[in-house]
């Protein structure tokens, strides 16, 4: 017995010594030809497997067998749906800004608003807005090739697809021109049509946009007859050059085209230089209450006295913005405007609807002061907001309810009184609304509501059955 416990060595399988000559390692050494190159045979045997890949060699040269995913109908549908979802964002913005849904009816302001939305949506930089200084009819008439030549790189096809989709949509619907009383009615609804040399049906609530003169969107601005001068003209927009303001005294329409172009250039220059505020504001601060696009709306709301001169919008006028720009003629009051529209106040409805007031003043989206007037002239709201009986003074009996309704109107469910009060405080410096000292939640309109609305405080109080507030 051996030390390994094997009794009979014959039981151990014989070791085969022939396999050593078949080892790959031995084969490599057998191929050595130069003694100093020990591994040359090994490299020679595996040189094809040891080649360093370039990254391109892993792909077949035959394009038919390419492993990269091709653009299939399914992937095209996904991309198309993604673009449609993006375009739906502009549909919401269009409704908020009062832009006609039919791009053929856009004015120069609407075209610019669309481009601003696109620049923000697609993070475009160095967009030359001056290339698109045209109205909707001119824009849609460009055709794809000319449009792509003007559009920013890489997104021209997407923008044209969006524009073409909007054009096809309204060609299929063949509906009447877009009218949105909740934002901005046509200015010639309430101006004297004869003074601008075009006619409007008095029974028609809104005139069609394409009935305007073709020489620009600014021909509906204030018309000053020959011989009349402006008294103490104050710039209603801080970027107005004083020399341009004086041009209001010339006769229109001959000079209106140059006036519009020069002022639009000022706006476009500010856009291209990055001086304009962010296109779309967040929920914080006074941006929650007033339209940040008032910079653009101010260009379409210069028509006459009742045009936000007395009650300025978010940032369109200076502190004395309640001075008139056209003192040569007696302005139409809101009361007369309602009568001309053949829309008398209905029972159970506000005497001063905010949507109609916004269209009357040309302020664009409904503003906070307009919304408060609507609530104050609605008998059903007297439990949470009402006149005190002392002139234009009013009280928020339930400020949270007022804030909730304002948030519902502006589609901001997180609105509360703290945020709403920021909008009210903004009005302090603009001499629109002041806080009544010593009284909680009591405010007063200090602007010229009498001439704007055509009602005295006593008339409104009598219509609403308001009794003097004896609470301190």
From Swiss-Prot:
One of its GO terms (cellular component) is nucleus. Gene3D superfamilies: Transcription Factor, Ets-1, Winged helix-like DNA-binding domain superfamily/Winged helix DNA-binding domain. This is Protein c-ets-2-B. Its main location: nucleus. SUPFAM superfamilies: SAM/Pointed domain (SSF47769), Winged helix' DNA-binding domain (SSF46785). InterPro entries: Ets1_N_flank (IPR045688), Ets_dom (IPR000418), ETS_fam (IPR046328), Pointed_dom (IPR003118), SAM/pointed_sf (IPR013761), Transform_prot_C-ets (IPR016311), Transform_prot_C-ets-2 (IPR027276), WH-like_DNA-bd_sf (IPR036388). It is found in: Nucleus. Residues 366-446 bind DNA. Probable transcription factor. One of its GO terms (molecular function) is DNA-binding transcription factor activity, RNA polymerase II-specific. Residues 85-170 form the PNT domain. It comes from Xenopus laevis (African clawed frog). Keywords: DNA-binding, Nucleus, Transcription, Transcription regulation. Signal peptide: none annotated. CDD domains: SAM_PNT-ETS-2 (cd08543). It comes from the Eukaryota. Belongs to the ETS family. GO terms for biological process: cell differentiation; regulation of transcription by RNA polymerase II. It holds the Pfam family SAM_PNT.
């Amino acid at each position: 017995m051996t030390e390994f416990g094997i009794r009979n060595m014959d039981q151990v399988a014989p070791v085969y010594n022939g396999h050593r000559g078949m080892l790959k390692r031995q084969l490599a050494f057998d191929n050595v030809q130069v003694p100093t190159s020990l591994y040359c045979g090994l490299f020679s045997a595996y040189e094809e497997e040891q080649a360093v890949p370039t990254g391109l060699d892993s792909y077949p040269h035959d394009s038919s067998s390419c492993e990269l995913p091709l653009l299939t109908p399914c992937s095209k549908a996904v991309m198309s749906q993604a673009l449609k979802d993006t375009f739906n964002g502009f549909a919401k913005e269009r409704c908020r800004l009062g832009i006609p849904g039919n791009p053929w009816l856009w004015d120069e302001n609407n075209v610019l608003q669309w481009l601003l939305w696109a620049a923000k949506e697609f993070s475009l930089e160095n967009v030359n807005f001056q290339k698109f200084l045209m109205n909707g009819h001119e824009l849609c008439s460009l055709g794809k090739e000319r449009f792509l030549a003007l559009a920013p790189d890489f997104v021209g096809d997407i923008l044209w697809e969006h524009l073409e989709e909007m054009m096809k949509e309204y060609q299929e619907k063949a509906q009447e021109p877009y009218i949105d009383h909740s934002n901005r009615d046509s200015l010639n609804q309430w101006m004297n049509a004869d003074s601008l040399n075009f006619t409007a049906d008095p029974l028609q609530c809104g005139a069609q946009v394409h009935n305007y003169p073709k020489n620009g969107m600014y021909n509906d601005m204030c018309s000053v007859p020959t011989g009349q001068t402006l008294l103490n003209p104050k710039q209603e927009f801080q970027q107005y050059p004083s020399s341009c303001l004086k041009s209001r005294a010339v006769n229109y329409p001959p000079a209106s085209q140059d006036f519009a172009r020069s002022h639009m250039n000022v706006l476009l220059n500010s856009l291209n230089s990055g001086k304009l505020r962010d296109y779309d504001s967040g929920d914080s601060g006074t941006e929650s209450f007033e339209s940040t696009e008032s910079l653009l709306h101010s260009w379409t709301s210069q028509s006459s006295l009742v045009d936000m001169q007395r009650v300025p919008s978010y940032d369109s006028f200076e502190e004395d913005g309640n001075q008139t720009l056209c003192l040569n003629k007696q302005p139409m009051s809101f009361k007369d405007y309602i009568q001309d529209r053949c829309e008398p106040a209905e029972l159970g409805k506000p005497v001063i609807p905010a949507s109609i007031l916004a269209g009357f003043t040309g302020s664009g989206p409904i503003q906070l002061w307009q919304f408060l007037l609507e609530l104050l002239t609605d008998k059903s709201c007297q439990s949470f907001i009402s006149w005190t009986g002392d002139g234009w003074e009013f009280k928020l009996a339930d400020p949270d309810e007022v804030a909730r309704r304002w948030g519902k109107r502006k589609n901001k469910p997180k609105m509360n009184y703290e945020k709403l009060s920021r909008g009210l405080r903004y009005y302090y410096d603009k001499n629109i609304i002041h806080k009544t000292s010593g009284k909680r939640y009591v405010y007063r309109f200090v602007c010229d509501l009498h001439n704007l609305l055509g009602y005295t405080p006593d008339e409104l109080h009598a219509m609403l059955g308001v009794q003097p507030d004896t609470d301190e």
